Amino acid sequence: MVIKSALKLISDAYAPSVLTLSTFESGTRAEESTQRAAGVTRDKNVNPFISLYEDVLLPSEQWEDYGLVGISIVGISQILPGLTLARTLKEKYPHLHVTLGGPIFSVNAKQLLDHPEFFDEFCHSVVTFEGEEPLHRLLTALKQGTALKEVPNLLFCEDGKVTLNEERVELRFEELPAPTFEGLPMDLYLSPYPILPVLQSRGCYWGKCTFCTHSFVYGHRYGKQRTKQMVDELEGLAEKYQTKYFTFSDEAVSPHSLNDVSEEIIKRGLDMKSLALLKFEKVMDEQLFQKMRQAGFIFLMYGLE
């Protein structure tokens, strides 16, 4: 209640903006257009992040030591905080290459072709779809001074013209390294223990819902980790970060995967507590749920389509 009350006071000071533990709404519909967004990212009367970044974030790092900063914007409530950070860095540190990424841009990439002002205001480039290999190639291009047109999955602006590199590069799951959380201030998160996000799969094993954009973001492609690799990752992260709490951030974990991962966790005798997102399936029965509970799946969130 204390934190909620504090956020309510902050929201009142920046009305009509509303800030909660998980969302930010400006009350100006600025997320709907680049012009409105540009205005709100400069307006200290409604945007609490401007002062936060200028007073706390910028002095905390030696930005002159960096050559590139990547900002991932996943959901709508992150648009204004993310763009405010991008604009602030781009203005304060002209040597930085600011690149944006995340599902928001993958879905709306072609709309940015008609908005060169977006790049003037916020960033130098945008990585669309899966970003591991494009980001690596972007870093290489910047280091070697080669043309950005050779970087796949990239939007950029030159001489007032926005270009979208159509080439798509996607890695197989076995090519992806385990996640790392080095450098993150884990002790500052509002939880008694670190709760680490992991991915057992990318895309959706169903992938047929016409209202959903997740399959589009992954190119209507589905891939998943092998069971042993997944549990190896969980075990390694648990030991490295001294936690037993995990969130499976998949769009939906398949029943088959849940069964196999649960069996492997039980087999190894691991003590874990996990959250997972699921889709209702007829094959989900009491036996599966008992096995999942034994493996530490204590919080399940269902999508009902």
Where are the regions a protein language model picked out?
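Conserved, mostly hydrophobic/aromatic
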Residues: L154, C204, M230, F248
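Flexible loop/turn segments at secondary-structure boundaries
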Residues: I76-L80, S106-N108, L135-H136, T163, ...
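Conserved SAM/AdoMet-binding glycine-rich loop
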Residues: L68, H95, T99, V231-E305
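N-terminal [4Fe-4S]-dependent radical SAM core
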Residues: R42, C157-V198
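Glycine-rich beta-alpha loop elements in corrinoid/cobalamin-binding modules
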Residues: S26-E166
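Canonical Radical SAM [4Fe-4S] cluster-binding loop centered on the CxxxCxxC motif
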Residues: S191-K228
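Extended, charge-rich helix/loop segments that form flexible
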Residues: M1-D43
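Glycine- and acidic
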Residues: Y66-S72, F122, P194-I195, H214-H220, ...
